[in-house]
Amino acid sequence: MSQYKRNLRKKKWMKFKWILVCTFKGVKARNRYLKKNHIFAQYGENNLFQPMKLPNAPQLIKIHNNVKVAADVTFYEHDAINGMLSVIDGKRYQMHGSCIEIFDNSFIGGHSIIIGNVSIGPNAIVAAGSVVTKDVAPGTIVGGNPAKVIGSFEKLHEKRKMTECGETLVYDPRDRADELWEQFYASLKK
């Protein structure tokens, strides 16, 4: 069996095991699996990786510490144009690959697309549904297609803190469901 076929078989087995882990285990088990099996070029501590689909070339992706990647995020770290070109003239073309690096304390919202050759953060947020085609500067929030700066990490961090009598309080929105519904309906009336 050729080296190419062995690598392809190994990759398919890895993806099959990933689907099993995602289906039958919790988020902590997913993260242990990613770290233990060295799926990515780098996978730091205190991360959350929710996508059920692994990138095709995860060895081109580095994820630092305290990075949260929401469900259905897609990473494009290579293209498949070489396959189309080879059909035209019967020649083999080299795959084009590019790296993605996500630095500490970053968040990528659900259904976002990250195109290769970019870095994100540190202290950066990618809004849900964004298409990231360029680097995301440290301390920024980006959103849209293509992603553009829409806010500041520091301002959001401060806004998310609740203060009472000079103390910072951390709360769980599930404990405040009635209050949040009231705020929601009040905003609809405006």
Q: What label would you give each PLM region?
A:
Residues I115, T133, H157:
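Nucleotide phosphate-binding site architecture
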Residues N47-L48, V126:
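Hydrophobic, membrane-inserted alpha-helices
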Residues Q50-I120, P146, S152-E154:
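Flexible, glycine/small-residue-enriched loop-and-beta-strand segment within the central core
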Residues N7-K17, I120-V132, I141:
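C-terminal/domain-terminus segments
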Residues V131-T133, A147-K148:
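Short Gly/Pro-enriched loop/turn and capping motifs at secondary-structure junctions
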Residues M1-A41, E45, A147-K190:
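Terminal amphipathic alpha-helical/low-complexity segments used for targeting or macromolecular assembly
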